[in-house]
Amino acid sequence: MLANSASVRILIKGGKVVNDDCTHEADVYIENGIIQQVGRELMIPGGAKVIDATGKLVIPGGIDTSTHFHQTFMNATCVDDFYHGTKAALVGGTTMIIGHVLPDKETSLVEAYEKCRALADPKVCCDYALHVGITWWAPKVKAEMETLVREKGVNSFQMFMTYKDLYMLRDSELYQVFHACRDFGAIPRVHAENGELVAEGAKEALDLGITGPEGIEISHPEELEAEATHRVITIANRTHCPIYLVNVSSISAGDVIAAAKMQGKVVLAETTNAHATLTGLHYYHQDWSHAAAYVTVPPLRLDTNTSTYLMSLLANDTLNIVASDHRPFTTKQKAMGKEDFTKIPHGVSGVQDRMSVVWERGVVGGKMDENRFVAVTSSNAAKILNLYPRKGRIIPGADADVVVWDPEATKTISASTQVQGGDFNLYENMRCHGVPLVTISRGRVVYENGVFMCAEGTGKFCPLRSFPDIVYKKLVQREKTLKVRGVDRTPYLGDVAVVVNPGKKEMGTPLADTPTRPVTRHGGMRDLHESSFSLSGSQIDDHVPKRASARILAPPGGRSSGIW
């Protein structure tokens, strides 16, 4: 808790409180960083700051489940550190972010986590937590996973089926990681693409002389995402472990997820605001820097129906969450791949624009109502991360992470006015309805009417508890009722075949009535004197009884009888 948060009292008056399951008119009173009262005609002490929310919505602060602040990736470091990244989040209406720790192969997960904490703690402006990447597998990794879950407040691990020779895990390794996640009550997050075929596709594209950003789209077709999605759901199901798919980008992958949920498999899924609102046509732009700015993986899809389809999947709960996957690079950094698209750093911005873009395309576009908007931008994340209802809901006792949202106000997005890093904005000149007027983080007003007022380091790390109910409750019950058992039967007491010279292919002993063929000499000649042929006319099968011969009187085709 902030040192002076106890002295901060806020009354949000006259607005409509929106949770994921209901909307109602109510005032909200905040004190000591906690929502104290929600209702009408509240009895509150004097000295409270009053915020007029008449005609506005009062919603839970957004939770962005995928950000990459201060991360080095593909030889480039993201332009946003934890201060500038969380500042942009708050300006956009997001009050909590989840960052990523990606250890190099053969390095310690715990050490990488501690290094990231040391970078983040003095910088963050809002609450945060961390996913930890599993980029290699060994017994030591499992032991460190347990340490992170039991002692460090981590309840999710990120894996990749792509990025061959960098982060990619084999199916057998995923199987082992899922077993560990199930045992520790953690959530396995997987980026699903067929890494082997992606690598081959990239080689083929380069061999054809394709070096520009369009090579990303060509070498990452959606069928490779769909195949990997089906495969990893199967692996998770075999280990009785939940699975969380990230960066879902295609209609095909969405259909695989929908089918798995219909079958009762515990599958959670997340897309990004970029995939749910943009298309891959940008990769074919004549301006190389424009095309490169959109390079992310999986790529944006050429099918113009994809983004609206993904938004529909968010609306019907096939997809649970929309994240930003914020990892911006400058044009200069992207230019490291100007002669080879495989060297363009993968990453786009979006932490500041996520809430407004989803409101515009989701709510204004008629795909979802304000309750579902709250679900996909905040409440579902809180439930999955085991933070609900402390976060993701406006009720007494919850953390005072609150946004006063104006559904009628508009803004035009531009790189020239953005707070987030980078010299490009994917949504340049996009006009959005839905604007955060006031952002309250941990009980303090940090953004109001265009003015940011929060110092770095005022955020806090939020430890995440294992075994979240929304993820594990069904699986725990299934383990009790569907436990695999062996069959209780009478032991077999008969003879058992003995294997001679194991490892060598043994020829079986021929039966008595099986003709044997003499050994062929070198050069292909047979010893005729060793043949089974006999001048007496006797044959090897003469002892087998023969049927009596019968003369067939009918002509070919059968006997016919005349009419006359």
From Swiss-Prot:
Gene3D superfamilies: Metal-dependent hydrolases, Urease, subunit C, domain 1. The keyword ATP-binding does not apply. The keyword Membrane does not apply. The modification Omega-N-methylarginine is found at R559. Highly expressed in embryonic and early postnatal brain and spinal cord. Involved in the negative regulation of dendrite outgrowth. Homotetramer, and heterotetramer with other DPYS-like proteins. Interacts with DPYSL2, DPYSL3 and DPYSL4. Interacts with MAP2 and TUBB3. This is Dihydropyrimidinase-related protein 5.
